Amino acid sequence: MASGTFDIIHPGHGFYLSESKKLGGDNAILMVVVATDKTVKNHKRVPIVGEKQRCEMVSMLKGVDEAYVGDEKDPFKIVKEKKPDIITIGPDQNFNPDSLHKSLLKKGLDIKVVKINDYKKFELDSSCKIIRKIKQTDFDMDYLENCQ
């Protein structure tokens, strides 16, 4: 099981999800929990893309078998329901794997937690870098006004 914001999809997301699925072996089912809009706003910034659309986009990515919007009241709800063998933490996520594992054990869930550290660097390897690049780009306003 992987989780994240997935606001503006970029190659780093694909790498994270691909590495997450590999950990499960040949017949792995990759489940992804997409952060709610409120969670994103509280921990990062206001999301550009809404949670339902982000979840649908993630569900379309290669290797993803199931995608869910997280639960605002209980962040462990989907984990308790689906009981994955492994939970992966992305390279940009500030969770301590040992702390998360201990929290899971307290809830009666003995789930392996793995931090995905290897991260292929791309010029635009984060949503923030993409947003910054868009802000710096001199767009033809006529084109943007006619965008549908």
Curated annotation (Swiss-Prot):
SUPFAM superfamilies named among the record's database cross-references: Nucleotidylyl transferase
Domain of life: Archaea
One annotated GO molecular function: ATP binding
Broadest EC class assigned to this enzyme: transferase
Binding-site residues for ATP, renumbered to this chain: 5-6, 10-13, 92, 119
The protein's annotated pathway: Cofactor biosynthesis; FAD biosynthesis; FAD from FMN: step 1/1
Signal peptide (from-to): none
Entry's Gene Ontology BP terms: FAD biosynthetic process; FMN metabolic process
Keywords, alphabetical: ATP-binding, FAD, Flavoprotein, FMN, Nucleotide-binding, Nucleotidyltransferase, Transferase
Catalytic activity: FMN + ATP + H(+) = FAD + diphosphate
EC code(s) of this entry: 2.7.7.2
UniProt cofactor(s): a divalent metal cation
Pfam families referenced in this protein's UniProt entry, alphabetically: CTP_transf_like (PF01467)
Subunit note: Homodimer.
Free-text function comment from the UniProt entry: Catalyzes the transfer of the AMP portion of ATP to flavin mononucleotide (FMN) to produce flavin adenine dinucleotide (FAD) coenzyme.
Xref: PANTHER family: FAD SYNTHASE (PTHR43793:SF1)
Annotated family: Belongs to the archaeal FAD synthase family.
Name of this protein: FAD synthase
Source species: Methanosphaera stadtmanae (strain ATCC 43021 / DSM 3091 / JCM 11832 / MCB-3)
Gene: ribL
